[in-house]
Amino acid sequence: MKDHRIADKLIEQRFEEISKKTDALPKTQVNYIFVTDTHADEYLLKDENGKLTVFEPEDTVNDRINQIAKHLEIAVNIANKNDNIDFIAVGGDLMNAYCIKGKEHVLSNLHRSVAPLKNSLKPVLIAFGNHDDNAFQFLNPNIPAAEREWIIIDKDWNEKVTDLFPGADGEGHDDRYEYSKYYSYDLKKKRTRIIILDTMDCRRPFDENGVVNGEMRLKRICYTDQQLDWLVNRAMTAPADYNYIFISHMGIDSAVNSNRMLGGETLREIIRAFQSRSSYSFSYTDINGEEITVNADFPESISGKILFYSFGHQHSEAILYSEDINLWQVATGCENMRGGEGEGGSDASV
C-alpha cells in the first residue's frame, strides 16, 4: 500500500486555507465545494493475448477508493464546519465504465468511494458523467461478450446513487420524465438557482428487470430537446432577481469539449438569449409524436445573471470566457489523477 500521508496533509491544509478565505466573504455570496472525476472502480487492461480481461490488483483498487473517500471526508468536514458553504457538488464520472463484473460490483465500489458524502450536513448535488453508465464495453470491439445487464440505467442512477445522499429540499425535477438526471436547486436566501444539467441524457429503454432492451449505440453525449425545454420553461423561470449557476459534467458544447455535444449549440443560444435579454426559439418532436415549439423569451425586467458554468471531464484546471454569451466557464481537474485511463472505447466514435 502506498504512503499518502504527505499528500493527505497538503490536501487538508489547502482545504483549511480555502475555508479561511470563504469565512471572510460576504454572507450573500454563493460558495460550494466541487469534486469531479473520481473514477473509483477497476481499470480493465489487456492480457498477453491482447484480450481485455485483466484487472488491476485488488490492493491497488482498494487503495485508490480509500484515498478518494479520505479526501471527500476532509471536504465534508470543511463544509459542515463552515456556514458560508452552501452545498457540495459532484461533477460526475464517479466510475470508469470498463467493468465487466456487472453493475452491482461497480455500484459497490462507487458507494465505498463516496460514502463520506452521506455525512454531509449540506445538500449533495450530483451530475452524471459519460463514464457513469458502465457502458464503454459496447464501444470496444475487443469485448464481444458485453452484457446489457452491466449497464447502469437512469433508474439505477436515481435510486442507487443520488437518492442515497443528502438531497436538497425543493429540488426541481422534470415531471415529464420520472428518471431525469437534471434538476435545479434554489438558494433562496442568496437569490440563486443552481441548475444541474445532464450531458448524457440518452435515455436507454429498459425492461421490468432494469435491463436495457433497446438500441445500444445511441448518441450518448447530448442534451435532449426535452431537457432544454425544461431548462427554458421550468429551470430558468426563477424570480427576476435570481442569479443562476450551471453545473454539469461537460462544458456547454463542442467549442469547450473534445466531444461533439448534441444540443450544445441550442444550449449556447438559450444562454445567449438570457444574457442579452432577447428571444430564441426551437422546435422538436416529443415521444408522442407531437410537434413542440419552445420560445425562450427573456425580458429586460430580469435583473439576475448567469454567474458561471462549472464542469469537469477535461481532467484539467481551466478558466474560460465566452465573449459571445458573456459567460465564465470553470473546469475543475479530476480527484483521481489516473482517472479515465484504460483500454476502453471512445465516445468520439458514437
Regions found by a protein language model. Give the residues of each.
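Short active-site segment of divalent metal-dependent hydrolases/proteases
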Residues: 40, 95-96, 132, 252, ...
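Extended active-site neighborhood of metal-dependent phosphoesterases/phosphodiesterases
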Residues: 10-20, 54-59, 99-230, 269-270, ...
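Residue-level marker for buried hydrophobic side chains located in beta-strands
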Residues: 32-34, 89-90, 126, 246, ...
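Active-site glycine-centered loops adjacent to acidic/histidine catalytic or metal-binding residues
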Residues: 37, 92-93, 129-130, 249, ...
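A short linear-motif detector with a strong N-terminal bias
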Residues: 7-14, 67-68, 104-105, 172-175, ...
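N-terminal active-site segment of His-dependent metallophosphoesterases
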Residues: 1-104
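His/acidic metal-ligating clusters that form di-metal
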Residues: 18, 70, 74-87, 118-120, ...
